[in-house]
């Protein structure tokens, strides 16, 4: 029996509110993080991802009190990212109730960080988050600090490097900056290139505008999980509608 594919609503949090932008800018308010998370828990989302989108830019820690508040109210796996730079940050997030932590910018500055964290905490709770922008045909580059800083690093090569070996990251959260918030679907070439290249689950992110896009991420992109925000935040679709649509397309999901 194939493993069920996961639907993961994403809470981008800025100044204590859930927000959603387009291509990492043009931010709109989408509600209180705890209330939004409770709704997704009630709707039977498979997981929730909480990203403090300005923590790395502002050089501060993730909003731990909000992670604690969400973890008290939801009973599905919670991934937390933003401003996590070292082992003490990971421990604080796990103690606050997170099940997994997503590392993005910090891994660029310390490429050994993922291995160190996976060895200490287990690869199952370490996610490498990659924000990728297309720079030419079949080539994507990593950007950091909320998509503001170019690194010159090839996104697919980085995904391979960060997941190889026993102490690599256990998952890849792969966001297309070109597609983010545009609602035209995932960058399927990017998603497929990554899923073909690594041996750990790929979470496709960036671009979902309708339910069909979720299925495309799995069937064409090879994703193990699909992440979306605005189609759920603003009430266009429910999690159950999304799962039913994926099931109708022959995808195994947990209803």
From Swiss-Prot:
One of its GO terms (molecular function) is imidazoleglycerol-phosphate synthase activity. It is found in: Cytoplasm. Transmembrane segments: none annotated. Its main location: cytoplasm. It catalyses: 5-[(5-phospho-1-deoxy-D-ribulos-1-ylimino)methylamino]-1-(5-phospho-beta-D-ribosyl)imidazole-4-carboxamide + L-glutamine = D-erythro-1-(imidazol-4-yl)glycerol 3-phosphate + 5-amino-1-(5-phospho-beta-D-ribosyl)imidazole-4-carboxamide + L-glutamate + H(+). The keyword Transcription does not apply. GO terms for biological process: L-histidine biosynthetic process. One of its GO terms (cellular component) is cytoplasm. Pathway: Amino-acid biosynthesis; L-histidine biosynthesis; L-histidine from 5-phospho-alpha-D-ribose 1-diphosphate: step 5/9. The active site is at 12, 131. Keywords: Amino-acid biosynthesis, Cytoplasm, Histidine biosynthesis, Lyase. It is an enzyme of class 4 (lyase). The keyword Cytoplasm applies. Its EC number is 4.3.2.10. It comes from the Bacteria. CDD domains: HisF. Heterodimer of HisH and HisF. IGPS catalyzes the conversion of PRFAR and glutamine to IGP, AICAR and glutamate. The HisF subunit catalyzes the cyclization activity that produces IGP and AICAR from PRFAR using the ammonia provided by the HisH subunit. Belongs to the HisA/HisF family. This is Imidazole glycerol phosphate synthase subunit HisF. It comes from Ruthia magnifica subsp. Calyptogena magnifica. The lineage of its organism: Bacteria, Pseudomonadati, Pseudomonadota, Gammaproteobacteria, Candidatus Pseudothioglobaceae.
């Amino acid at each position: 029996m194939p493993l069920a594919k996961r639907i993961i609503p994403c809470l981008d949090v800025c100044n204590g509110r859930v927000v959603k932008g387009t291509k990492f800018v043009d931010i709109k308010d989408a509600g209180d993080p705890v209330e939004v998370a409770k709704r997704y828990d009630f709707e039977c989302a498979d997981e929730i991802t909480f990203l403090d989108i300005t923590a790395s830019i502002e050089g501060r820690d993730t909003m731990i009190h909000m992670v604690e508040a969400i973890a008290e109210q939801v009973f599905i796996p919670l991934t937390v990212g933003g401003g996590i730079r070292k082992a003490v940050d990971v421990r604080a997030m796990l103690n606050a109730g997170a099940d997994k932590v997503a590392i993005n910018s910090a891994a660029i500055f310390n490429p050994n960080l993922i291995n160190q964290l996976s060895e200490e905490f287990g690869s199952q709770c370490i996610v490498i988050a990659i924000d990728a922008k297309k720079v030419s045909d079949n080539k994507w580059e990593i950007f950091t600090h909320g998509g503001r800083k170019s690194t010159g690093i090839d996104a697919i090569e980085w995904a391979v490097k960060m997941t190889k070996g026993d102490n690599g990251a256990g998952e890849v959260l792969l966001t297309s900056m070109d597609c983010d918030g545009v609602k035209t679907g995932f960058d399927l070439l990017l998603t497929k290139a990554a899923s073909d290249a690594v041996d750990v689950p790929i979470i496709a992110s960036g671009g979902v505008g309708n339910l069909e896009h979720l299925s495309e991420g799995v069937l064409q992109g090879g994703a193990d999980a699909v992440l979306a925000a605005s189609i759920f935040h603003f009430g266009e679709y429910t999690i159950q509608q999304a799962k039913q649509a994926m099931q109708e397309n022959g995808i195994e999901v947990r209803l």
